[in-house]
Amino acid sequence: MPDITFPAPESHVPGYLAVPDGQGPWPGVVVVQDVLGMTTDLRRITDRLAASGYLAMAPALYGRRPKIKCMISTIRAHFAGRGAAYDDLVAARDHLIADERCTGKVGLVGFCMGAGFCLVLSSQGIFDASAANYGLLPQDIEPLSRSCPVVASFGAKDRIVAGGTAAKLEAVLARGEVPRDIKEYSDVGHSFMNNWGIPGPVRIIERIARMAYSEPEAEDAWQRILGFFREHLS
């Protein structure tokens, strides 16, 4: 699958595009990175979405130079709820819609920091569905009552996302009667869907930090995401 570049307001952005086999058109999905950036895991996630019938693109939000400045800017944008990173994600959506292989429906999926971006963008009326996995809620959650459909997954043992986040998200979406599937898994922490391929001896650090990959919960979350996208992006 090819690396690409696409136009955005500030400059061109690199990214990774995964295309399904067979004949399109297909719905699109913008895949939003976690704080680690364009990892092998992110490419694998993008490939999985393509294998499930989605024209999937992961923008490299750290792809501009100088890289350290770009990283700081992206992380700040995540917490501020505005900035060039959001413009890049909207530009990625526009790039997919302009692709003749796309049906015109586009969803979002994000993990950790990426899920935070998803939750902010979900209420802006430009995406058709959003999958936010263990993300921080926006500072102002009320716009989420006007969100696109949301599927979200959290770990009860998460040491980064505050306890009660899943319930707060459920409540604000319910107020707006937003289609939703919110689930908190009791036995996992942060990043339980991210399989970074960390060597075995180092995995104890993941477990202590409660950031370890857990296949049963990850696969359950994936099936919920794919089912939700089939319903709302078809």
Predicted feature descriptions by range:
Residues 3-101, 196-211:
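Serine-hydrolase catalytic machinery in alpha/beta-hydrolase-like enzymes
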Residues 61-64, 136, 188:
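Short beta-to-alpha linker loops that shape the active-site pocket of alpha/beta-hydrolase fold enzymes
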Residues 90-147:
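Primarily recognizes the serine-hydrolase "nucleophile elbow" in alpha/beta-hydrolase
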Residues 152-154, 158, 185:
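Short beta-strand/loop motif that positions the catalytic acidic residue
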Residues 157-162, 190-191:
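Acidic catalytic loop of the alpha/beta-hydrolase fold
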Residues 179-234:
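C-terminal catalytic histidine-bearing segment of alpha/beta-hydrolase fold enzymes
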